Amino acid sequence: MTQQRPLSHVMVVEDDRDTREVVKLILEMEGMGVTEAADGFEALDRLHKLRELDPHRPCAIVLDIMMPRCSGAEFRKRQLDDPLIADVPIIVLSAIADQLRTDDLHAFARVAKPFDPDQLIKVVRRACDESVES
């Protein structure tokens, strides 16, 4: 039996392994493929590899802000400076999300931790739908 590729593929960038695993599980239960990264540098590397395989993947990035080595803000700056990956929308998932203006990061949306799984799913689906349309 051939395994079908998920319709939506999302990258989750989160330094806390437990949170990353929970987000991954929630998205996979919704039929989405997930690529994980523990910080911004790892995310940039994996994002390039995904884009080389398929220019439409991932359809969105769920991004923590407070991470060691390369923060979410630094990741976003580097992402926007790179034409190959600049168009992938981000969803800020952070305990400080309420203090951030998504305009500052050109984010698609923000979800505050602790998060409601249904809200996260709805926002990710909307980002992926809009990403596919553009």
Named regions from a protein language model:
Residues 17-36:
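Two-component/phosphorelay signaling modules centered on CheY-like receiver
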Residues 67:
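Receiver (REC) domain active-site loop signature in two-component systems and cognate sites
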Residues 64, 94:
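Active-site residues of response regulator receiver
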Residues 1-11, 24, 51-55, 116-134:
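Non-catalytic signal-transmission and effector/linker regions of two-component phosphorelay proteins
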Residues 14:
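Conserved acidic carboxylate
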Residues 36-60:
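Acidic, metal-coordinating helix/loop segments flanking the phosphotransfer/catalytic sites
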Residues 39-42, 70-77:
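Acidic catalytic/metal-coordinating carboxylates
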Residues 74, 86, 96-112, 118, ...:
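Alpha4 helix (beta4-alpha4-beta5 surface) of REC/receiver domains from two-component response regulators
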